[in-house]
Amino acid sequence: MRLALHELNAAREHLISNRLGETFKMISRVARIFEQLNNAWDVLRTMTPSDYSSFRDALGASSGFQSHQYRLIEFLVGNRNCAMLKVHEHRPDLLAMLKAELEQPSLYHVALRVVEQELKLSLPGDAFRMAEPHQCNKSIEDAWVQIYQQPTEYWMLYELAEKLVDLEDYFRRWRFNHVLSLIHI
């Protein structure tokens, strides 16, 4: 998770600086990290509930969805739900770190700014609310449709979209595998 966070932060900084090539490299690397994490579930799924119970206490609150690193990744990429901060209230240092992330634009916020600039659009301000979950927005959807309908004209934006979709796919599968494994054990 630490490497994923490092790479996602770097991707965001490169995207802010409009260095798309570097951004693509970082996002691709994070997608590969989650691909490897997904592959690990093939081994972890062989564990029985008693196998898992033998070491679960050693993980403390640092495992899975309670992990502050997991939550940082969620917030950094753009899945921002402030209700999830409550899990970390017992650790003021981690809570402060998570709140600080919510004050930064997410990777998706920055991607929307790039889309807005490149397409010469004016996306609605509510698309850029830092600490709130994204809402469906016709203007944003229309911008992505325009990019996907004309990929050769907007190749770099199309490539950005594809990198984000790839990352989301691996991350979503990791979350799904995590939940299924926990149900099993």
Give residue ranges: language-model regions.
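Non-transmembrane, amphipathic alpha-helical segments
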Residues: 15, 19-29, 54-65, 132, ...
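Internal, well-folded beta-alpha domain core
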Residues: 90-178
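Conserved small/polar residues in nucleotide/adenosyl-binding loops
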Residues: 183-185
